[in-house]
Amino acid sequence: MSSCTVAENNVEEVKPAWQAVYALALGVFGLIVAEFLPASLLTPMAASLHVSEGMAGQAVTATALIALVTGLVITPVTKSIDRRWVLMFFSVLQIISSLMVAFAPSLNILLLGRLLLGIAIGGFWSMSTATTLRLVPAAMVPKALAIIFSAVSIATVVAAPLGSYLGAVIGWRNVFIICALPSVVALLWQLWVLPSMRPESVGSFATLFRVLARPGMIGGMLATILIFSGHFAFFTYLRPFLETVALTSVEGVSLILLGFGVANFIGTSVAGYLLSKNLRLTLALVPFVMSLLALLMVMFGHVALLDAFLVAVWGFAFGLVPVGWSTWLATTVPDEAESAGGLLVASIQFAISAGAAGGGLIFDMSGASGVFTGSGFLLLSAMVIVFAGVKVKPVARDE
């Protein structure tokens, strides 16, 4: 019997451990809040550390860079360690990271703390799909992933506004101390409910290349890069577009972004249902819809009310993306889900950097409308690749 068949049989026999799924979701909430906090606290952080805002902004860059590297190396490095302890270690790293940032006397110490957070983020996401496969039956994987990614949506919605508000009230250092609390609770909860999960495959760097060589994997990773690049190019320059084209006020921009966050949460919540109906169609239609939205923004972006609607629909559509591609990973390579997860994390982190950087170059040449046009092209290309070059297996049905 092949290793793939063994893995699939093991998955099907798993009894759902929903408390463990929710404990991981709480840990994810803490990780994502910590990741996005600097964006809303950049000015006071820079002033306190006596550096420029540009230098303080490297706190975000450092996290993304180390997350990319960690996603690729975490499986080989921890190949002999019980996954229960590895996952809890990521919660410990988030706690240490937040406290290091909170008490950092210099930018160097702050960046070191952010590097630890990058290890936790890259490591967790590379193992998230493989862990989910071992916590719930195959038919329930989309639902479990939707729960975990719902925590991402909630964290994304609350991190920036709550961080900005609390930073003004209690100071940015105290905000990072509070940020450690969800991970403390998550760590204790995980200690209580996470089962022992011995490594099921011997991960190595060679395994990454073997997984990538499987039919449809390169197409899937390329589609992922295009979708995330298109999204982050669009989202990074959304505010300048709203302020210059639609002449939206600061309050109006905040409301539109809130609408995005709420719709994103709803999209994530219903992702499991839609993906279980037709995985390939969902993976293909989402970037197609997003490309149409980008084009409509370019054509009718001067109407603020319409922009609010289009951005909300974009948020809903993008809510399906992380769950969708994690589900694709779980159904395509269940026997090497950790190594494949590392490739997915690296692809996403690369896409985030490329989307923001490439969008910046286009923005300087042709403004936000040019960025949105380029974003639409990337997303449309992703749809074509999903249909033509991605191997998709149907999601198991929950009888």
Give a label for each model feature.
Residues V69-P105:
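Conserved MFS/SLC helix-loop-helix module at the cytosolic interface between two early adjacent transmembrane helices
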Residues T332-A368, G374-S375:
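A late C-terminal transmembrane helix in Major Facilitator Superfamily
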Residues T70-D82, G267-L279, F363:
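Helix-to-loop junctions at the C-terminal end of transmembrane segments
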Residues S97, N108-L116, L305-V313:
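Paired small-residue
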Residues L281-W325:
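C-terminal transmembrane helical hairpin of 12-TM major facilitator-type secondary transporters
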Residues G113-A151:
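Cytoplasmic helix-loop-helix junction between adjacent transmembrane helices
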Residues L107-I109, A138-W192, F241:
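Helix-loop-helix hairpin linking two adjacent transmembrane segments in secondary transporters
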Residues H50, D82, F103-I109, L247, ...:
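Helix-breaking motifs and short loop linkers at transmembrane-helix boundaries and internal kinks
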